[in-house]
Amino acid sequence: MKKRTVGLLLLIFILSASPQSYGQEKLLNPGELYDSSMELYYKGRCEEAIQGFLKIVQSTPASKLVSYSQYMIGLCYLKMEKHEEAIQQLELYLKTYPEGDRIKEAEQGIQIAKEQLRGKPSPQPTVSKPVVKKSLPEEKKVKRRICAQVSYLGGKNLEEVEKRVKELKNAGVNTILFRVFQNKGDRVYKFVTAHHEEGVYFKTEYAPVVDDILGKVAEIVHRNGLEIFAWITTRYANYGLEGHPEYRCKKYNFETKKMELARGFNLFHPEVLKRLEGLFRDLGRYPIEGILFQDDLILRHNEDFSAEANKAFLKDFGYSPHADLFYIDPYKSDSGKYYTKGYTDRFMSWANWKNRWLMNVAKRLMETARESNPNLQFAINLYFEAVINNLNGVAWFSQTLSGALENNFDYYAIMAYHRQAMKDRNIEAKEAIDLMAEVAQKAVKSVGDPSKVLMKVQILDWKSYEVLPQKEAEEILAGILNHGEVSLAFFPYIEQFPFHSLKEKWTPSKKSSE
């Protein structure tokens, strides 16, 4: 009897101790678990990634990350070429989340899996190739673009504007990236009648209209056989809203150790998102081929601590963002700027979360603009750091190429500004040119189709206002084009730059004859 009693007590102890010891294991919150699972996915460790995504689905049903996790389970199976399982999981996503953000991508994934099951030859599995590239629409081929990015035109009237467009056409340019926003203090187009110091160049009720000129410029561009993308801001499109601090982003001041208003919109505020949707909806009504997101669709390492952002993060992660949790040994440099010696794991979770939020905002705006023009194409500006170093990209800008790839932009516009890199990194021209060639190589490898990689070449030194010498332009083009016939954008367009002399450098005929 005594032995039975002891045995029973031992059994009770074991049963009661087991859950306790399990509970002492480090359990990641949904956001951290999602980030770690995504990292496994990109490393090709899909079975492990599936386990992480499943934990989110099963243990945190109220999290916004559940729908994304269900979608990613399907992508993992697709990447492993388990096509029946992929179809099952992606169809489950469509059924469970009919209003989800990944509806189109899930449908494309199902289509690809079904084609493989019908007997089409399967591609050789590669660990490094994200399945996102497979899930792009097979029938939708983008053209290679040679662009002039226009931040300013010196023409005094539309006749002179047309003359510039004809010159670009003859030089081999096929696309104009036209600035349709006006920041206070920047140069105003000479051919417009400015009604406001800041705003936009198309008709809308969601921002001050400097002048409704986009339609006329588009007509000129099309008349001369070119295409036009409207280049527009997002975070910095807070024109005329200085009196609304609640719409502003908040940043942490390392010197005062306090929060303060930062430049630009708080993209977590519902009214701000409605305003941007209205802006993009109106822009989409114009006869344009596409829209280029300005490089302001970022959040730096000390932005956004707004109330709305903090509340949204708390809901997903279970704790509020705080500077004390994020930054390792901040210090003031000789230049007066503040840097940190490192970032905590919690900071990286916050930065990755901000990246996802920004990409979802972009997706929302693309869908809104396509309501009136379903054929609109979209390009997103990316810092080159987001291509060569995911950790730096997400830490400094809340931006990564891999994150952008998940949202299926038509073009990935990489700001390969070598002169700027020389200044920022204190390096010589050759090293900067080689760096941009490396950026092109990595971008093409990640994106797949070189035409979708839009390498932006700096042709004016911002500091000295020197136009890039032709020899230097040839060197950077040679380095970039060595990795494929990528699309190109010359920035900023300036009349003195020798486009005609460089035309043969980017044409396929020249490349194939060498």
Model regions and ranges:
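Short solvent-exposed coil/turn linkers within tandem alpha-helical repeat scaffolds
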Residues: 27, 57-66, 93-109
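Active-site-adjacent "subsite" loops/lids of carbohydrate-active enzymes
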Residues: 139-148, 229-286, 335, 339-347
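Catalytic domains of carbohydrate-active enzymes, especially glycoside hydrolases
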Residues: 160-187, 285-290, 404-412, 480-488
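Aromatic-lined carbohydrate-binding/catalytic grooves of carbohydrate-active enzymes
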Residues: 171-210
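Aromatic-lined carbohydrate-recognition surfaces of secreted/lumenal glycan-active proteins
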Residues: 227-234, 292-299, 329-335, 343-397, ...
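Substrate-binding cleft of secreted/luminal carbohydrate-active enzymes
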Residues: 401-514
